[in-house]
Curated annotation (Swiss-Prot):
Disulfide bond residue pairs: none
CDD domains given in the database record: AdoMet_MTases (cd02440)
Record-given protein name: Ribosomal RNA small subunit methyltransferase H
Catalytic activity: cytidine(1402) in 16S rRNA + S-adenosyl-L-methionine = N(4)-methylcytidine(1402) in 16S rRNA + S-adenosyl-L-homocysteine + H(+)
Cross-referenced Pfam families: Methyltransf_5
Known role: Specifically methylates the N4 position of cytidine in position 1402 (C1402) of 16S rRNA.
Entries under SUPFAM superfamilies matching the protein: Putative methyltransferase TM0872, insert domain, S-adenosyl-L-methionine-dependent methyltransferases
Highest taxon, organism lineage: Bacteria
EC number: 2.1.1.199
Enzyme class (EC, first level): transferase
GO terms (BP aspect): rRNA base methylation
UniProt entry keywords in alphabetical sequence: Cytoplasm, Methyltransferase, rRNA processing, S-adenosyl-L-methionine, Transferase
This protein's encoding gene: rsmH
Length: 310
């Protein structure tokens, strides 16, 4: 069962100012929580396009959202193909777009998917199970320098070199096949005082490998640019992030689109192509309430940013 507690449900969807007959996109369908709440506010003329590259998520959501089948279109593809997929369906402008980034609870809680450092499972971590690159390939075949790069930049791990060196040592002797083996290697590589603070010692390394396997940051950069372009005037975009790397991409994209390019001073009229594209609605990101965090500890690091197309 693809059970998943939706984070910042009302805040993210209500922030889109839903029009009953509008066209909306949920770029991260997951368990279907945001989509269900959004669909409940649409009339028969409203439309929702829901993206997910995980076949498990699509199958579950089709059942959950069966009563809205005339209003929802499921698209099993990475959201980096947002514009391409909508254009293919004759959609060139939309009223609202939602991103809820990060791994869904069912992916984390299904041991054989290999996302979690709490279960021993094959090193996989693919959100799209048809792609070839897995966590096993990265851990066993990527060179030391590449491992250091992803651990430091995607995991913000200060012991990146030590972990990469330990992986290199171990894989010379035997293949590293499971998440459990990798956790043991990470624990050996990180100094004892550091292991005792700051959460699970494998958290940052697992995040880094997952981001690399799924090319998450580049995919999001491409998708958010397309999303801003696709919005109608007055349309809104809600983005929920779970770590600083994603949040930075969102913050920069919103800031750049809300400022417009630098212009020479003294222009009597600003040409349309130089006007800002967005107005930022959330000066500071919206974060979950203490009550929400108490009910769903995975919501703790969530941040919601909203912007409106001018």
């Amino acid at each position: 069962m693809f059970q998943h507690t939706t984070v910042l449900l009302k805040e993210a969807v209500d922030g889109l100012h839903i029009k009953p007959d509008g066209i909306y996109v949920d770029c991260t369908l997951g368990g279907g929580g945001h989509s269900e709440y959004l669909l409940s506010q649409l009339s028969e003329d409203g439309r929702l396009f829901a993206f997910d590259q995980d076949d498990m998520a699509i199958e579950y959501a089709k059942k959950r959202l069966a009563r809205y089948e005339k209003q929802v279109t499921f698209i099993r593809r990475n959201f980096r193909f947002l514009a391409e997929e909508l254009t293919a369906r004759g959609v060139h402008r939309v009223d609202g777009i939602l991103f809820d980034l990060g791994v869904s609870s069912p992916q984390l809680d299904t041991p054989e998917r290999g996302f979690s450092y709490h279960h021993d499972a094959p090193l996989d971590m693919r959100m799209n199970r048809e792609q070839s690159l897995t966590a096993y390939d990265i851990v066993n075949h990527w060179p030391y320098e590449e491992l250091v790069h992803i651990f430091f930049h995607y995991g913000e791990e200060k012991f990146s070199k030590q972990v990469a060196r330990k992986i290199e040592e171990v894989r010379k002797e035997k293949r590293i096949e499971t998440t459990g083996q990798l956790v043991d290697i990470i624990k050996e590589a990180i100094p004892a005082p550091a292991r005792r603070s700051g959460g699970h010692p494998a958290k940052r390394i697992f995040q880094a490998i997952r981001i690399a396997v799924n090319d998450e940051l580049q995919a999001f950069k491409e998708a958010i640019t397309q999303a801003i372009d696709l919005l109608k005037s007055g349309g809104r975009i809600s983005v929920i992030t779970f770590h600083s790397l994603e949040d930075r991409i969102c913050k920069v994209a919103f800031k750049e689109a809300s400022q417009g390019p630098q212009l020479p001073p003294g222009l009597p009229l600003i040409p349309d192509q130089y006007r800002p594209a967005l107005k930022i609605i959330t000066k500071k990101p919206i974060v979950p309430s203490e009550e929400e965090i108490e009910h769903n500890h995975r919501a703790r690091s969530a941040k919601l940013r909203i912007a409106e197309k001018l």
